[in-house]
């Protein structure tokens, strides 16, 4: 079978990583087309990859006959139009989060995809492909902790881009814990509340940081998340699940734990998301490529998962303003098997 020909749209940090990943570490695929809103950047990336060329218009890149599948690493505001083009051209697509930037358009994408014979959209929630998260999921599903009752999460970044505001902590950071909650517990989130502690003096004036998110699932499980994106330290992601017969935690350390001055200890902390989750990204893309080549098109989070995350985050942004718990309202999930197709 010939290699899957992939168009990578958006070659900033994430997109350029995907080009390098597909070119050097993924089997059964190659990058045939790249696109970016900065054409010179796309031309530079294309010149470094054999058999790759830059296409100026992202919709032309999707429609290109030398493209079998698409990776979207473009700004979220462009996703709706690009996803619609992928559906129109029946091109499987790996879409980095968010699915779209609002709940209504995310739901419309879900409904349109459900009208097709096979799903085409996979959403890039990479933690589902991380070795530690997969082990934690297996532990829960195997019943070793008994009924999971509570989950505690930490999500810290050393810093954020200049355009970041308080709502993006919910939409860009908390969204990962939202998907982790749904993935680990296998149920939807019923409500979300954002609590605002004393803000970090080092945070930009327009950013309320840290924030504490409190999620409640439909069965009543409690999840709390510390979101602190201006620590100035490192990238820290930890998750602890407490069950009726014990608990389990991941993300405690990276590398050597050392003893130094009396009464202290320490180790290495991942400086960024690529160091912490680089292997998960590799696994995610390889499994997606394998699924597309096999004709199933997805092996991971679906368009519905992207929509559900958007709905929870929308409730979170509302709670950020009010400080109160906000219910999450989800539409009925479309059933592909019951939809009549012309």
Where are these regions (language model features)?
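N-terminal Rossmann-like dinucleotide-binding module
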Residues: 1-49
């Amino acid at each position: 079978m010939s290699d899957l020909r992939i168009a990578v749209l958006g070659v900033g940090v994430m997109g350029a990583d995907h080009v390098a990943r597909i070119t050097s570490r993924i089997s059964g695929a190659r990058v045939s087309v790249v696109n970016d809103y900065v054409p010179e950047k796309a031309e530079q990336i294309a010149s470094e990859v054999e058999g790759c060329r830059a296409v100026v218009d992202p919709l032309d890149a999707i429609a290109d006959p030398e493209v079998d599948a698409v990776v979207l690493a473009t700004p979220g505001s462009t996703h709706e139009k690009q996803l619609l083009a992928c559906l129109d051209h029946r091109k499987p697509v790996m879409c980095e989060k968010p699915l779209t930037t609002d709940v209504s358009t995310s739901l419309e994408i879900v409904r349109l995809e459900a009208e097709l014979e096979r799903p085409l959209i996979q959403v890039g929630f990479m933690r589902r492909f991380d070795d530690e998260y997969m082990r934690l999921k297996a532990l829960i599903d195997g019943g070793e902790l008994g009924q999971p009752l509570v989950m505690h999460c930490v999500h810290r970044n050393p810093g954020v881009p200049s355009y970041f505001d308080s709502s993006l902590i919910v939409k860009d950071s908390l969204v990962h814990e939202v998907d982790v909650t749904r993935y680990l517990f296998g149920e939807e989130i019923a409500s979300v509340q954002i609590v605002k502690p004393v803000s970090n003096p080092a945070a930009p004036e327009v950013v309320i940081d840290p924030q504490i998110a409190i999620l409640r699932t439909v069965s009543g499980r409690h999840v709390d998340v510390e979101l602190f994106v201006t620590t100035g330290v490192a990238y820290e992601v930890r998750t602890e699940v407490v069950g009726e017969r014990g608990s389990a935690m991941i993300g405690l350390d990276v590398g050597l734990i050392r003893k130094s001055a009396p009464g202290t200890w320490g180790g290495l902390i991942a400086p960024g998301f690529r160091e912490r989750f680089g292997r998960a990204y590799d696994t995610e893309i390889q499994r997606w490529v394998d699924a597309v080549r096999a004709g199933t098109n997805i092996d991971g989070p679906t368009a519905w998962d992207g929509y559900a995350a958007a709905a929870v985050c929308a409730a979170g942004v509302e709670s950020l303003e009010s400080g109160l718990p906000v219910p999450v309202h989800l539409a009925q999930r479309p059933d592909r098997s019951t939809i009549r197709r012309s």
